Amino acid sequence: MVGKHCILELYDCDHAKLNDEAFLRTTITTAAKRAGATLLNLITHRFEPQGVTGLALLAESHLSIHTWPENGYAAVDVFTCGDQTMPEQACELLRQELGAKNHALKSFQRETPAALATAVRHPKA
């Protein structure tokens, strides 16, 4: 396994928190720590009239969030390499901190072609 990739959809979130760049910076930093990841850099941008995008560069890969306060929605992407981190923990913290009433989480393992080749069974001809 190369790593784990989590895609999180957050619905019915706290509109004010989704538009608060400082809050999101703190929350992203905490989420990275909760996942057991090492934060290398964090870039955020607040859009006018609303919305924030945040991108955390992790030693293990990345965490990103894009918010639409007017819809109470946030799109989150967490990818971590190796098996020592827990991206689901970052997702759970973000869900709680943004007050999402509903969410959808998709999680899957990233594999190298060699690992996939050994996992795929070809039927005998």
From Swiss-Prot:
Pyruvic acid (Ser) PTM positions: S61
Gene3D superfamilies for this protein: 3.30.160.750, S-adenosylmethionine decarboxylase domain
Alphabetical GO biological process terms: spermidine biosynthetic process
Catalysed reaction, written as an equation: S-adenosyl-L-methionine + H(+) = S-adenosyl 3-(methylsulfanyl)propylamine + CO2
Superkingdom of this protein's organism: Bacteria
Cofactor binding note: Binds 1 pyruvoyl group covalently per subunit.
Chain positions of site Cleavage (non-hydrolytic): E60, S61
This protein's pathway: Amine and polyamine biosynthesis; S-adenosylmethioninamine biosynthesis; S-adenosylmethioninamine from S-adenosyl-L-methionine: step 1/1
One GO molecular-function entry: adenosylmethionine decarboxylase activity
Enzyme class: lyase
This protein's GO CC annotations: cytosol
Required co-factors: pyruvate
Positions annotated as active site in the UniProt record: S61, H66, C81
Keywords (A to Z) from UniProt: Autocatalytic cleavage, Decarboxylase, Lyase, Polyamine biosynthesis, Pyruvate, S-adenosyl-L-methionine, Schiff base, Spermidine biosynthesis, Zymogen
Protein function: Catalyzes the decarboxylation of S-adenosylmethionine to S-adenosylmethioninamine (dcAdoMet), the propylamine donor required for the synthesis of the polyamines spermine and spermidine from the diamine putrescine.
PANTHER family per record: S-ADENOSYLMETHIONINE DECARBOXYLASE PROENZYME
Oligomer status and interactors: Heterotetramer of two alpha and two beta chains arranged as a dimer of alpha/beta heterodimers.
Family that this chain belongs to: Belongs to the prokaryotic AdoMetDC family. Type 1 subfamily.
Protein name (database record): S-adenosylmethionine decarboxylase proenzyme
Protein's organism: Prochlorococcus marinus (strain MIT 9313)
